[in-house]
Each structure stands twice: as C-alpha cells, then as structure tokens.
Amino acid sequence: MSGIIGKKVGMTSVYDAVGNYVPCTVIEAGPCVITQIKTVETDGYKAVQLAFDDKKEKSTTKPLLGHFKKAGVSPKRKLVEFKGFENELTLGQSLAAQDVFVEGDFVDVVGTAKGRGFQGVVKRHGFGGVGGQTHGQHNRARHAGSIGACSFPARVFKGTRMAGRMGNNRVKIQNLQILKVYPEHNLLVVSGSVPGSKNSYVLIEK
C-alpha cells in the first residue's frame, strides 16, 4: 500500500464522458518529502515516512529539527508512514501526486471527520423518534425510547446507541476514483466526498 499526504481544498462537481453529474473533491496532494526509510534490519519492518506542509523552525521541537536535518529537509507539519512502496527511494526525495497516482486509479482516503459536538440519537444514529405527538405526549418526539427491560437483565448493555459526542473520529472512505490529476498544481480530483473540513489533512492510499 503506497500513498501520499494531502490537504482537502474543497468540493466541486464535473460531468463525465457520458454526461453524468459527478460530485467530487479537490485535494492538494504533496509534494511530500521522504524523512525516514525504515528497514527490517534496523526497525523490524519496512516502511517509508513522508512529511508534508512547511512549518516554521521556531515552532518545531528540537528532536524533530534534528530528524528533519538528518533528512536534509525543512521542518514539516505532518509526518505519516506508508508501507508498500516498491521502487527504490532515497532520503530527502520529493514525491508528487503524479509520481504515485494516475487518472482512473481507485484510492482510499483517510481523514478526521468534522466534530459535531454532543448530538441526540436522531442526528447521531438516524433514529426515527417515537412517533406522533398524541395522547398528551409533547416532549419526547426525538428521544431514544426504551434502552432495556426492568428486572431482567436489570442493566443497559454496552454499545447501546444513545446521545453523545459525534464526529471528530478517523474515517476511511474506500474506492474513490481519481478523475483528474493536475501535476502543475499538485492537485487530485477524486469522485465523491472525503472526511474533514477544508484545509484538513487526509491520507490518499492506493
């Protein structure tokens, strides 16, 4: 599994060759630099560490400054490991979107979903509420209803769907097609939506 780090730019829409309307997401993918190459001999597994998005030196910790200096690159904000790069890579090498992907590829996109705060069961789990407001009912339309029996089992089971914090979790959207690659701007256009808000980091995995 090879991939690259990107930043969500926003959503738009295009028409495909047949004339179908396709909603899509624009992602700024790279350029990323290789800051570490892990091998079985030294680390116990094989992986490549990529870094993306420049960062001020004064905002970087000294251990990380040393790490970037060893790779011969300027400080970066986001560091992620990827496994599965087949071709030979060198420390400090730059990887752009067109080096990893071509138009028509199907990719998985990983990101952090927007935080929604404390939400009820209708929004959080898609409950239908408890029916019409009849027979005197006036304040239970969007409540969960029963969460268990009384004397048996005399407890609420783990995992029962209730109100609570929604979003702000890691989400992977699979099998999104790359509709267009713009090498001059390091942009990918993928079909559908991806998790996160504008300017949030995403991982594009092949």
Swiss-Prot record:
Keywords: Ribonucleoprotein, Ribosomal protein, RNA-binding, rRNA-binding. Pfam families: Ribosomal_L3 (PF00297). One of the primary rRNA binding proteins, it binds directly near the 3'-end of the 23S rRNA, where it nucleates assembly of the 50S subunit. One of its GO terms (cellular component) is cytosolic large ribosomal subunit. GO terms for biological process: translation. This is Large ribosomal subunit protein uL3. The keyword Ribosomal protein applies. Part of the 50S ribosomal subunit. Forms a cluster with proteins L14 and L19. Belongs to the universal ribosomal protein uL3 family. Gene3D superfamilies: 3.30.160.810, Translation factors. GO terms for molecular function: rRNA binding; structural constituent of ribosome.
